[in-house]
C-alpha cells in the first residue's frame, strides 16, 4: 500500500510540478542510525556572493553531534556561534547547553555552523577592506539558509532530515539570536521554529540605554557611587583646568592618553562586565569593583541595601586604587601587539592613533576586526553616556562620533571601497522591523537586567512598551539575571532560569509535534487527490 501511494504521489508531482525535494513527506526511517557518526565535522562549499555565483565559493566549517538523534526524519537543532571561532564554542553541541538539551528532548541532532569570516570559514586570505565587502547581513543570512537547503549531512544519507521533511530548529544567543530573528523575518519557511536568547533586534547609534538595566540590577550603593564618579570625571574634563585634568588622568594611571574622550571611555569600560555575569558564577569582576568602591571585604549581594550618603572623594579614591591595581595592569599587553607591550601600557585605549598595529592587522584570526566591520557597517549599538536628564554610569564624552572616528581609522578606503560611513540605525530597522518583530513559531527570552534587553523586544524603551507574548511568538523575561542565562545548564541552579528553560523546551517540543501534524495533513490532502483520481 505504501509503494502504491508513493507511486501515485510521484505521478501527481509530475503533473503539479512539485519538486521532489520539497514534497511534504515523512517516510518512516528505513535506514538504521549510523552509530559510528555520533559526532564529527564537515566542510560545506558556501557561496561567497549569493547574488553573483561567479565570485566563487569558500569552505564553511560545520560540526555535528547525533548522540540523541532518532535517525532519518528526526529533528535538526541548528546553531551558529556568531562572532566567534566555532572551535571555541563546540560545547554547544552537548547537553551542557540549551541546543544539546533540546536535542535530547526531541531526539534531534545538533548541527553547529561557523559564521563566514570567523575561525576556519574564510573567503579570503586576509581581512582587507576590499575583501570584507562580502561580509554583509544579507550574505550572512543567505549562508545559513543555503546550508540548510542544500547540505548533505554525513549522518543523514537518505536526506530524510532535510528541512522539507523534518523540523529544523534554530537556537541562538546574543548576536546569533538576532540572526535567528532576522532570518525568521526575512527568509521564512526554511527553519520550522526558532529560539532567540538575548536577541538585540533594534539597532541604535547612541545606545545609551545599554547601561539602564545595569543601573537597575546592580547594588544600588555601588550604582550611586559610580554615577557620582562619572559625573565628576565629566565635569573635570569638560570644565576643569589643565592641571585638574592631568591630575585626574594621573590618578587613574592614564596620563599617557592624549584625548580626554579616550580617558573617559577607559574609566567607563569596567561597567560593561555586568553583562558577563551568570547565575552560576562564584566570582565576577563587576562585584569585585563594587566591593573596592565601597571598601568592603565581602562580595556584594544582589540585594545589597542602599546605605549612607555618597562620599565622592572616598569612592573616587577607592575606584582609582582598584582600577590601577586590578583592572589596568596587563590590559593592553594581553593583546599581543608589540606597540602595546608593557604591564602598565594604556595605548590600546587610544582610539585616534592610526599607526597602531591592531588597526593594520589583516590576519584572518583577528576576530575583533571582523566584528568591528559588522558594528561599523550594520548594527552600530555603540554604548554611550546617557542624556543629561538622566544619571549615567558611562561618560557623556563618549558619543557615536567617538566610535565613527575609530571606524574610519580601521577601515580606510581601498580600491574605491570603504565601510558604510553613511549607515543609519533606520537602515537595518526598516529592513528587519526592529523592535516591532512579529513572527511565527519564534520564542524570545531576555534577562531582566541584561544590558542588551534595551535593544530587544522586551525593552522598556520600546515605544509601545515591552512586546506582549503570543502563542506564535512567546516572550519570556527571566527575573533577576543578565545575558543569555538560559543557554547554560549550569545556570539551572537559579529557579527562574530553570523555569524559563523548561518552558522554552516544552514549547519547542510542541512545535516539533506540530510539524508532523501539519505535514501529515498535507500528505492526507495528496492522498485524497490520488484516490479521487482513481
From Swiss-Prot:
Q: What is this protein called?
A: Serine protease vicPa
Q: What is its EC number?
A: 3.4.-.-
Q: Which gene is transcribed and translated to give this protein?
A: vicPa
- Active-site residues are 174, 450
Which keywords label this protein? Glycoprotein, Hydrolase, Protease, Serine protease, Signal, Virulence
Q: What does this protein do?
A: Serine protease, part of the gene cluster that mediates the biosynthesis of the secondary metabolite victorin, the molecular basis for Victoria blight of oats. Within the pathway, vicPa and vicPb are probably involved in the processing of the vicA1 and vicA2 precursors. The pathway starts with the processing of the precursor vicA1 by several endopeptidases including kexin proteases as well as the cluster-specific S28 family peptidases vicPa and vicPb to produce 7 identical copies of the hexapeptide Gly-Leu-Lys-Leu-Ala-Phe.
Q: Which GO terms describe its molecular function?
A: dipeptidyl-peptidase activity; serine-type exopeptidase activity
Task: List the glycosylation sites.
Answer: 65, 126, 297, 416, 436
Q: Where is the signal peptide?
A: 1-17
Q: Which SUPFAM superfamilies match?
A: alpha/beta-Hydrolases
Quote the InterPro entries the UniProt record gives.
AB_hydrolase_fold, Peptidase_S28
Please state which protein family the record places this protein in.
Answer: Belongs to the peptidase S28 family.
Q: Which organism is it from?
A: Bipolaris victoriae (strain FI3) (Victoria blight of oats agent)
- This protein's source sits in the domain of life called Eukaryota
Pfam families named in the record = Peptidase_S28 (PF05577)
Asked whether the keyword Metal-binding is assigned, the reply is no
One GO BP annotation of this record:
proteolysis
Pathway assignment: Mycotoxin biosynthesis
Amino acid at each position: 500500500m505504501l509503494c502504491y501511494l508513493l507511486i501515485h504521489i510521484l505521478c501527481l508531482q509530475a503533473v503539479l510540478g512539485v519538486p521532489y525535494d520539497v514534497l511534504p513527506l515523512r517516510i518512516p526511517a528505513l535506514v538504521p542510525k549510523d552509530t559510528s557518526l555520533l559526532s564529527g565535522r564537515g566542510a560545506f562549499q558556501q557561496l561567497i556572493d549569493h547574488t553573483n555565483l561567479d565570485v566563487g565559493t569558500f569552505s564553511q566549517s560545520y560540526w555535528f553531534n547525533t548522540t540523541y538523534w532518532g535517525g532519518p526524519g528526526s529533528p535538526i537543532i541548528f546553531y551558529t556561534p556568531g562572532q566567534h571561532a566555532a572551535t571555541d564554542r563546540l560545547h554547544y553541541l552537548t547537553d551542557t547547553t540549551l541546543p544539546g538539551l533540546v536535542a535530547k528532548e526531541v531526539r534531534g541532532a545538533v548541527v553547529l555552523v561557523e559564521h563566514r569570516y570567523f575561525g576556519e570559514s574564510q573567503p579570503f586570505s586576509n581581512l582587507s577592506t576590499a575583501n570584507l565587502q562580502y561580509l554583509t547581513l544579507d550574505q550572512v543570512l543567505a549562508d545559513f539558509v543555503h546550508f540548510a537547503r542544500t547540505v548533505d549531512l554525513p549522518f543523514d544519507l537518505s536526506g530524510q532530515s532535510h528541512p522539507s521533511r523534518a523540523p529544523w530548529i534554530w537556537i541562538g544567543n546574543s548576536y546569533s539570536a538576532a540572526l535567528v530573528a532576522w532570518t525568521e523575518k526575512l527568509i521564512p519557511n526554511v527553519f520550522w521554529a526558532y529560539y532567540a536568547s538575548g536577541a538585540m533586534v533594534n539597532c541604535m547609534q547612541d545606545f545609551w540605554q545599554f547601561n539602564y538595566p545595569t543601573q537597575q540590577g546592580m547594588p544600588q550603593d555601588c550604582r550611586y557611587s559610580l554615577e557620582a564618579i562619572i559625573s565628576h570625571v565629566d565635569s573635570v574634563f569638560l570644565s576643569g583646568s589643565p592641571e585638574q585634568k592631568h591630575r585626574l588622568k594621573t590618578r587613574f594611571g592614564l596620563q599617557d592618553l592624549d584625548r580626554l574622550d579616550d580617558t573617559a571611555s577607559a574609566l567607563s569600560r569596567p561597567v560593561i562586565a555586568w553583562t558577563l555575569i551568570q547565575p552560576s558564577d562564584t566570582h565576577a569582576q563587576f562585584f569585585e569593583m563594587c566591593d573596592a568602591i565601597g571598601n568592603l571585604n565581602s562580595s556584594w549581594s544582589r540585594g545589597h541595601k542602599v546605605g549612607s550618603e555618597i562620599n565622592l572623594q572616598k569612592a573616587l579614591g577607592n575606584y582609582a586604587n582598584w582600577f590601577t591595581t586590578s583592572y589596568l595592569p596587563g590590559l593592553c599587553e594581553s593583546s599581543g601587539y608589540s606597540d602595546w607591550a608593557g604591564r602598565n601600557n594604556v595605548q590600546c585605549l587610544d582610539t585616534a592613533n592610526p599607526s597602531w598595529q591592531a588597526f593594520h592587522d589583516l590576519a584572518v584570526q583577528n576576530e575583533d576586526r571582523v566584528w568591528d566591520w559588522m558594528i561599523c557597517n550594520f548594527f552600530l549599538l555603540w554604548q554611550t553616556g546617557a542624556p543629561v536628564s538622566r544619571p549615567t554610569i558611562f561618560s557623556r564624552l563618549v558619543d557615536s562620533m567617538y566610535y565613527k572616528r575609530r571606524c574610519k581609522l580601521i577601515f580606510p578606503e581601498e580600491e574605491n571601497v570603504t565601510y558604510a560611513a553613511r549607515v543609519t540605525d533606520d537602515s537595518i530597522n526598516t529592513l528587519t522591523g526592529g523592535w516591532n518583530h512579529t513572527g511565527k513559531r519564534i520564542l524570545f527570552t531576555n534577562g531582566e537586567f541584561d544590558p542588551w534587553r534595551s535593544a530587544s523586544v522586551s525593552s522598556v524603551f520600546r515605544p509601545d512598551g515591552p512586546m506582549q507574548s503570543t502563542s506564535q511568538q512567546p516572550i519570556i523575561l527571566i527575573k533577576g539575571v543578565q545575558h543569555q542565562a538560559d543557554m547554560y545548564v549550569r545556570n539551572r541552579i537559579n529557579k527562574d532560569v530553570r523555569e524559563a528553560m523548561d518552558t522554552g523546551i516544552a514549547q519547542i517540543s510542541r512545535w516539533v509535534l506540530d510539524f508532523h501534524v501539519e505535514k501529515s495533513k498535507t500528505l492526507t490532502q495528496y492522498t485524497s487527490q490520488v484516490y479521487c483520481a482513481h
